[in-house]
């Protein structure tokens, strides 16, 4: 038996087998969790059903987080099928391409800001609020994926950095709000990983090289490492951890000065 046996978890954001969310689903399945999945784009529906089947799940639901009725429909379906929910993974983020390339101000606009914050940030507490009745009395856990670009200026990350900064704050406020119900809220800040989402960030390959050169472990990280950390945070083993941003980045966040050639 794994340490998530008996847990019912919802995973969002699985787009490919290179997604961090895929690594999370893989680890949670290994540890015995029962999983459900959502997708935001019909293009990925059939692919996701295939992934879900690998993890013993036939619960694959549409959920565009900009549409409250779709969130409500997921709540209704999971309530019918499971009754309760032991946690969810918020792996959702988007910013218009022009706002995550080049100079910050040149790509900055009101529309891009609204879009990035609505999809990437608002959706985390919105899902927590929607799922709250299902999570009460279950020592449940909420988990999101953030990035160091919400704390420090990272080239080209730009408007998404603003969204991640707000997402980090949302994690802390959710921890405070949900704690009285015994529900935890945390975030994983993974280092750069070659995912479909990351491919949209200009200069991403350079970020990988910088991390490999300067992270204390001298390498990048994998979706499996992020997944193992997520499985722990979603489990009762992490019962005393909430409001935390857990770095899975080979120690890169701890380095103040980059290594330079003599």
Name each region found by the language model.
Residues 179, 184, 241-243:
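Short, small/polar-rich loop/turn modules that mediate ligand/substrate recognition or access, typified
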Residues 8-12, 88-93:
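Conserved hydrophobic beta-strands of the Rossmann-like cofactor-binding core
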Residues 3, 83, 219-248, 253-254:
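C-terminal substrate-recognition "lid" of short-chain dehydrogenase/reductases
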Residues 63-72, 76-81, 90-116, 155-159, ...:
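Conserved mid-core segment of classical short-chain dehydrogenase/reductases
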């Amino acid at each position: 038996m794994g340490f998530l046996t008996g847990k019912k978890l919802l995973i969002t954001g699985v787009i490919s087998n290179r997604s961090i969310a895929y690594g999370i689903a893989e680890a949670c399945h290994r540890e015995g969790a029962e999983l459900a999945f959502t997708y935001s784009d019909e293009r990925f529906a059939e692919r996701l059903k295939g992934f879900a089947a690998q993890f013993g799940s036939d619960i694959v639901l549409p959920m565009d987080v900009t549409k409250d009725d779709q969130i409500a429909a997921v709540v209704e379906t999971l309530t019918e099928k499971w009754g309760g929910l032991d946690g969810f993974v918020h792996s959702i983020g988007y910013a218009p391409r022009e706002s995550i390339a080049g100079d910050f101000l040149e790509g900055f606009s009101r529309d891009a800001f609204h879009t990035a914050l609505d999809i990437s940030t608002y959706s985390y507490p919105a899902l927590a609020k929607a799922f709250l009745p299902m999570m009460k009395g279950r020592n449940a856990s909420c988990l999101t994926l953030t990035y160091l670009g919400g704390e420090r200026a990272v080239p080209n990350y730009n408007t998404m950095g603003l969204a991640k900064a707000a997402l980090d704050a949302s994690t802390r406020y959710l921890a405070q709000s949900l704690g009285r119900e015994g529900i935890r809220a945390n975030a994983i800040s993974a280092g750069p990983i070659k995912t479909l989402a990351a491919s949209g960030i200009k200069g991403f390959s350079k970020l990988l090289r910088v991390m490999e050169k300067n992270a204390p472990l001298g390498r990048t990280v994998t979706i499996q490492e992020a997944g193992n950390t997520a499985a722990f945070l979603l489990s009762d083993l992490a019962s005393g951890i909430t409001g935390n941003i857990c770095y899975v980045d080979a120690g890169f966040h701890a380095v103040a000065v980059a290594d330079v050639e003599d």
